[in-house]
Regions:
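Short cysteine clusters
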Residues: 23, 27-30, 205-208, 224, ...
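Conserved alpha-helical substructure of the radical SAM core
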Residues: 1-105, 109-110
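Radical SAM enzyme [4Fe-4S]-AdoMet core and its adjacent flexible, acidic
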Residues: 105-238, 242-243
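Residues within well-ordered alpha-helical secondary structure of globular protein domains
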Residues: 54-57, 82-85, 172-175, 227, ...
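Flexible mid-to-C-terminal extensions adjoining Fe-S/redox cofactors in radical SAM and related proteins
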Residues: 1-11, 225-292
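Residue-level signal for mature regions of secreted extracellular proteins and peptides
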Residues: 16, 20-23, 198-201, 217, ...
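Short, hydrophobic secondary-structure boundary micro-motifs
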Residues: 39, 155, 252-253
Length: 292
């Protein structure tokens, strides 16, 4: 197998670790089709620790724990500690439905930040999307608590329903003290796929794999959690460095339609909501409504 050398400009600096497919919610647009019946997959806690060590050796600067709901994995806090001990920042992408009191001390550690999804300023609309009654009140309360504690937080709002109160949700978040807010449309991937259609690469931002890499609960490596059908290897069989230097990785990047404007994409362009934060490749990708 030949080795492909990736330029330092596009080499992954962020690794998305989808540590579980389990989630208390079952959002109607979830790209990973996560839910209460999801599992932690084939990867063990030791496997995840090894991937984090590989990421550190490759000079990556951030690990994102995502799911599913990452806090449903029994080792999530240990994985946060592992990354921080190796000098890598951590983002925990949580639905903020259930936060145990003791978890706040983990989330408040230096080098850790939070991300979550929000859908409406009305409980009935928010809960219709998450399919879990009470999720609006619990997520809203935990957002307020994260802000109170000074934990860095970004929130993604996805437009799922016709006439959804996206603007009102943004204003409510701003009133709570949230300063980083992104909005996006639903991507037709995963649970939101159109009936009878296969995965469509034009639903991606066009820069998947450029600055980031994802590892799924199976150990499979893809350019992004959104492009999960573009499997380039498995960390249970090969090291991350070997996979990123392999032909399958290069072929996967080539299979993704390029951005319309040809400009570079921020390596932080990773899921900011259950259906991602990059605009589709057929549009000007990453042209987001993003309040700094």
């Amino acid at each position: 197998m030949s080795t492909v050398v990736e330029s330092t400009a596009t080499a992954p600096k962020v690794v998305e670790l989808e540590i579980t497919g389990a989630c208390q919610l079952q959002c109607t647009q979830c790209f990973a089709e996560s839910g209460p019946h999801g599992t932690h997959g084939a990867m063990t806690a030791d496997d995840w620790r090894r991937v984090i060590s590989d990421a550190a050796a490759l000079g990556m600067r951030e690990v994102q724990l995502i799911g599913g709901e990452p806090t449903m994995h029994p080792a999530w806090a240990e994985l946060v500690d592992r990354a921080l001990c190796l000098g890598i920042g951590v983002e925990v992408y949580s639905n903020l439905f259930h936060i145990k009191p003791g978890w706040w001390s983990v989330l408040a550690r230096e080098g850790v930040k939070l991300a979550t999804s929000y859908y409406s300023d009305r409980a009935e609309e928010h809960d219709a999307i998450t399919t879990r009654p009470g999720s609006y009140e619990r997520t809203r309360a935990h957002i307020a608590e994260a802000v109170r504690r000074g934990i860095p937080l970004r929130v993604g709002i996805v437009s799922v329903l016709r006439g959804q109160r996206v603007a009102e949700a943004r204003r409510e978040l701003e009133a709570l003290g949230v300063t980083q807010i992104r909005t996006d449309r639903t991507r037709h991937l995963g649970r939101a796929s159109l009936p009878g259609t296969e995965a469509d690469a034009t639903e991606l931002c066009g820069r998947c794999g450029h600055g980031q890499v994802a590892v799924l609960p199976s150990g499979e490596v893809t350019p992004c959690v959104m492009s999960r059908w573009l499997v380039t290897g498995n960390v249970r069989k090969s090291g991350l460095a070997a996979i990123l230097g392999g032909e399958s990785w290069a072929e996967a990047l080539h299979a993704i339609p390029a951005r319309a404007d040809g400009n570079s994409c921020d390596p932080d362009c990773k899921p900011a909501s259950d259906s991602g934060d990059c605009s589709p490749a057929e549009r000007d990708a990453c042209d987001l409504k993003y309040d700094e």
